[in-house]
Amino acid sequence: ILESTKGSKYTVLRPTLEDFVVEMPRGAQVIYPKDLAPMCMLGDIYPGVRVFETGIGSGALSMTMLRWGAHITGFELREDFLNRAVNNVKSFLGEEALSRYEVSLGDSYEDCPEGEFDRVMLDLPEPWRVTPTAEKILVPGGLMVAYTPSITQAVQVRESMGKGWVDQRTLEVLHRT
């Protein structure tokens, strides 16, 4: 509680992750909190889970998964977006979070990350182009979540998945206040 020079008292609160995501510096369009929570729930994000994230943008999904304890390896095509995401992570979650956040410039349509992952999280204009990569890098039983703002994109992702995937779902989230 702070007191002004005129004697008024104010309670100063730390912003929540939701507050920060909505107001943070950004270059790319962000995934909003109404979608971040279901993505992390359906992606079964937990402490220690190894995630490959691509299309990092301003880092909203990254911060949410890091807050839930994930270890993230990520690709971002644009250096300005990558730098913004790293700065946003550091600003809100602190320096410690960067030890679980290995992101680099990369084109996930062309490049494949090293290693195996428990989860693949996609926020790209054409996520169906990364489905073959996801199949290669996911451990058996691994999960892929694709954020697709249009139904056309969602259909193309589903069609790209083939029969080797279990529990394919399309979910629309509506938030009313």
What residues fall within each predicted segment?
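N-terminal auxiliary segments of SAM/dcSAM-dependent transferases
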Residues: 1-14
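Conserved SAM-binding loop and adjacent beta-strand
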Residues: 23-37
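Glycine-rich helix-loop-beta junction characteristic of Rossmann-like nucleotide cofactor-binding loops
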Residues: 41-46, 112-114, 136-137
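Conserved class I S-adenosyl-L-methionine
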Residues: 46-57
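Conserved SAM-binding loop of SAM-dependent methyltransferases across substrates and taxa
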Residues: 58-69
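Conserved S-adenosyl-L-methionine
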Residues: 67-73, 140, 165
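S-adenosyl-L-methionine
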Residues: 75-127
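C-terminal substrate-binding/active-site "lid" region of AdoMet-derived donor-dependent transferases
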Residues: 128-177
